[in-house]
Amino acid sequence: LSLRFIEVMRTNDNSAFFERHHTPGAAVAAKLEAMGWLPMLRPSGAGPAIDYAQPNAPGRIGIIAPYGKDFCATCNRLRVSAKGKFHLCLFGEHGIDLRPLLQADSQLDALVARIAKLTGTKPFAHHLHDGISGGTPHLASIGG
């Protein structure tokens, strides 16, 4: 059994909700550790989640804390929206249109080359700590 806690993230349409309901991932981690849950070592490249385990528990609890230390440094996620926009970060200003390259199998090599080139431009960090959530109106719009 695996359970994931995803820290609520500010987006363009949820400022009031965020202010009322945001619980830092660090607070959840502190409570888990106080109850005997221990952070597990994860292999490099495993993504930004921090998993906790307890010897007497049947599963794990993971925390995805975008406001936490080193979150962006460990992020290995990219998204393509239903509209064909490629998002290097959930909180970027805009997506990059890949739709023309998604229309035909004959475009596969060009698509792979474009994604490889763009991946090298992934930003090092979001600006959530500054109250800037980018151009995403809400995470559902890009599959988040």
Predicted regions and their residues:
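Radical SAM enzyme [4Fe-4S]-AdoMet core and its adjacent flexible, acidic
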Residues: L1-G62, D109
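Short secondary-structure boundary segments
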Residues: E7, A65, L90
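Glycine-rich, flexible loop/turn motifs
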Residues: N14, E19, P48, G68-F71, ...
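Mixed-charge, polar/low-complexity N-terminal
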Residues: Y52-A53, G59-G62, P66-G68, H129, ...
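Active-site oxyanion/phosphate-handling segment shared across diverse enzymes
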Residues: P55-K85
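Flexible mid-to-C-terminal extensions adjoining Fe-S/redox cofactors in radical SAM and related proteins
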Residues: A73-G144
